[in-house]
Amino acid sequence: ALVIAAHPGFPARDLGALLAAARARPGEIGYATSGNGTSPHAAGEMLWGRAGVRLSHVPYRGSAPALTDVIAGNVPVLIDNIVSALEHIRAGRLVALAAMTG
């Protein structure tokens, strides 16, 4: 399963609010993943396309650097494996917006 999570300073607290923000600011909101062509990247692009919004993909070379940059506030949103992000969500370093399965 994947999770869409955000830095605690990002105003969205659920997927609907993220999509509304993306509609208001097309292409201005970045989302980090573990790299181009990965499952999180593909899932994000499919979701944004179906929702009719545009977010800017920020690819990293693995999950750890993506998590680090979102926690630091350098990128506002992350799509990652829920196992990798769960500890940070529980600690309040990330806010879970939605889970993706299937």
Q: Could you describe each region identified by the protein language model?
A:
Residues 13, 85-102:
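C-terminal lobe and pocket-closing loops
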Residues 1-65:
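Hinge/capping helix and adjacent helix->loop/strand transition within the periplasmic-binding protein
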Residues 46, 50, 64-74, 83-91:
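Short helices/loops that flank or line small-molecule/ion binding pockets
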